[in-house]
UniProtKB/Swiss-Prot annotation:
It holds the Pfam family AhpC-TSA. The active site is at C112 (cysteine sulfenic acid (-soh) intermediate). This is Peroxiredoxin Q, chloroplastic. Residues 1-65 form a transit peptide. PROSITE patterns: THIOREDOXIN_2 (PS51352). It comes from the Eukaryota. Induction: By salicylic acid (SA). Disulfide bonds join C112-C117. It comes from Gentiana triflora (Clustered gentian).
Amino acid sequence: MAAICLPVAKHSFPSLLNTQTPKPLFSQNLHTIPLSSQSQICGLKFLISSPSSLPPPPSYSARISVFAKVSKGSVPPQFTLKDQDGKNVSLTEFKGKPVVVYFYPADETPGCTKQACAFRDSYEKFKKAGAEVIGISGDDPSSHKAFAKKYRLPYTLLSDEGNKIRREWGVPADLFGTLPGRQTYVLDKNGTVQLIYNNQFQPEKHIDETLKFLQSA
């Protein structure tokens, strides 16, 4: 503990005794001290921070920017993106039938490959339910083409380079904003969202949940 030295005038010790009630060291008006980053009390510096002045966590603004904008019962933003063959594909082309739109992190990653192959294996069930499947990630069309060819994917993969559509739809990121989210939407024949399913670490459950919903609709 730091020692504080106070100058003492040359008086006899008894004269230093004061019979009056001592004043408190800190005034009752202490709350009027401005909440700045540094304040001085009795010559000592204290760091005082107001909660409103604290900087947000690094990923706070990023999380806000991807906070879910598309909700159940809403019509999501339209898009036109290139598919694995380099052709422009618009969401409006699928109006009149249910559409499963699933956003995934990246081609050729373990979880995304499992998810893609699970959609492939159940693709005929989706077709029987009258639905189309669309996968979207930030990979370019050539990556999608190789991915679809390698795993014999029969459905459309769209390239959202720059993740513009991901942001517009408000797909939430995972692991404190470091990992693109894995989220699936089911749109009805009118283009209205009827189901939103998010599960980063159980990619194959997206197929189970969406099929269950479509088959019960």
